[in-house]
UniProtKB/Swiss-Prot annotation:
Protein name per UniProt: Xylose isomerase
Record gene name: xylA
Summary of subunit composition and partner proteins: Homotetramer.
Main location: cytoplasm
Reactions accelerated catalytically: alpha-D-xylose = alpha-D-xylulofuranose
Amino acid sequence: MTNYFDKIEKVNYEGADSINPFAYKYYNANEVILGKTMADHLRLAVCYWHTFCWNGNDMFGVGSLDRSWQKQTDPLAGAKQKADIAFEFLTKLGVPYYCFHDVDIAPEGNSYQEYVNNFNTIVDVLEQKQAETGIKLLWGTANCFTNPRYMSGAATNPNPEIFARAGAQVFNAMNATKRLGGENYVLWGGREGYETLLNTDLRREREQIGRFMQMVVEHKHKIGFKGTLLIEPKPQEPTKHQYDYDVATVYGFLKQFGLEKEIKVNIEANHATLAGHTFQHEIATAAALDILGSIDANRGDPQLGWDTDQFPNSVEENTLAIYEILKAGGLTTGGLNFDAKIRRQSIDPYDLFHAHIGAIDVLALSLRRAAKMLEDQTLQHIVEQRYAGWNGELGQQILNGKSSLEALAQAAQHLEPQPVSGQQEYLENLVNSYIYR
């Protein structure tokens, strides 16, 4: 293993009183909460793209980060060095999973065959790294949005040859994900949307991407991939309007093409912000629709209208999010992946550790608070009491199809229903009593 981060041997749990910046204050992987270890609840993952591929560039400036593996004259040698350093980081951080896009791990090359050869070479490397370290792949995916060929979309492209090239990438990425023991496969429609309706056939593009997803499901079953397929909702950016706008929109799409039993969602906090929702809302919606799959843990900036991909730092926000996950029975094949990047001015390599350690502690403390809320059942009891009338005779007749508008009109003659307080202020105080205890 490399020793790029030679100042750190291993990040360990030292407790809330520790002043060691390279120690966990709240994340104790083996601590049992609600019958599961903290590690099993959170299933933490580090993303390859922001952590090891981004060079610090933005729309107004070139890269600011000094990454030795990005300076290699041989791109494939650079990819191998990147894998060495990535697994050093993962091992020292002590997280069980990682995630990647195909072109994160291997250079795309100048032809399809070169792409395949490079990709397979690095998949061999990752397979060996996983065997050596015990680190696993949470999910893989294909980047069908960066290359200029995808400027008008991949599955929604007006050119079927580009559709085919995207299909080939997904074919290779799915096969690699299965080979590496990946527990999920993610599809994010980065450019599956439009800039203007003046040159867009909405019905056709919707049918194209519907067929693409059906082909993905068909291939999953053909190769015997046992993981979960996930769509990641996002309302806009890079396109003006994306077809996977939010969780509810994705569910409608899945229903239209008969895929609601085959595909779930990977929810990103920052994407919820862009869609005008809370993180909690998107998770609760997915759970209610039985399509909650996995989480991209990050945060956005409410004052900015773009995907800032900052590390999560709010125990208040994440306690409510994890509470919804726990209510839904927890994550199965999914996990909490840090789809987040350090800031452009954070040029010290060890800033990567500070960012992840802080975020992991935020999620760990949020898990503790959410678990206590669920265990006490105080909040849930109030909600159940609020809807208790639906368990009575009238409520059951309505829900079971044994009533009609005419029957309701007759029943209403003998009813004088009175409003009951929603107790929002009390409930907010109750939640704060758990968070800040």
